[in-house]
């Protein structure tokens, strides 16, 4: 692993002092040193992730891909939602249940690879789309962890909605899958310029 200047690195950069900001919003200030955050490393060579005290009840957010890579490309994660308490490394008191299995990062980075929310952002109208034919129509985000099958106003009969899909807002212990169409969309981004450079990066 190397920094943009070729030095050995763990991939971690921290900034705890020299800023009066105690929480951050979705205005991307956390992605700029001049605004109290940290500048991105070359986004064609690194997948950037900013971890901070994110305000407004948000767990995290990701930036969608564009024809030319934005210098802010990456994800922002609220610090209690980073990491997992279910690995061989043990448990960490700062990670908050029920978002303690790393699914927030997984969900946010999926946006970077062109995956949309299951419900199509149509406010329950059942007319929106996530552009994946193999995900059931869904009215809105879910929370908690339902028993299977679970129906809603857009998928009224069994098997209902796919609340286990990583692009829903269910608890981390529920989120365990992507569909083939979602995989195809992600690979299409990763295999196309300029994002394909990430596959051969020495970062």
Predicted regions, residues:
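Metzincin-family zinc-dependent endopeptidase catalytic domain
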Residues: 1-145
């Amino acid at each position: 692993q190397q920094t943009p200047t070729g030095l050995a690195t763990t991939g971690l950069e921290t900034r705890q002092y020299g800023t009066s900001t105690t929480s951050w919003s979705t205005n991307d200030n956390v992605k700029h040193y001049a605004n109290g955050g940290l500048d991105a490393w070359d986004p064609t060579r690194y997948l950037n992730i900013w971890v901070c005290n994110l305000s407004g009840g948000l767990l995290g957010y990701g930036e969608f891909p564009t024809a030319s890579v934005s210098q802010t490309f990456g994800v922002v994660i609220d610090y209690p939602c980073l990491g997992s308490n279910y690995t061989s490394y043990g448990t960490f008191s700062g990670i908050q249940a029920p978002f303690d299995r790393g699914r927030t990062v997984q969900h946010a980075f999926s946006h970077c690879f062109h995956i949309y929310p299951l419900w199509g952002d149509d406010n329950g109208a059942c007319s929106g789309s996530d552009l994946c034919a193999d995900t059931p129509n869904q009215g809105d985000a879910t929370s908690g962890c339902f028993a299977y099958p679970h129906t809603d106003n857009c998928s009224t009969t069994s098997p209902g909605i796919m609340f286990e899909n990583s692009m829903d807002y269910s608890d981390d212990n529920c989120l365990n899958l992507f569909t083939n169409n979602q995989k195809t969309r992600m690979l299409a981004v990763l295999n196309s310029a300029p994002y394909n450079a990430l596959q051969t990066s020495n970062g």
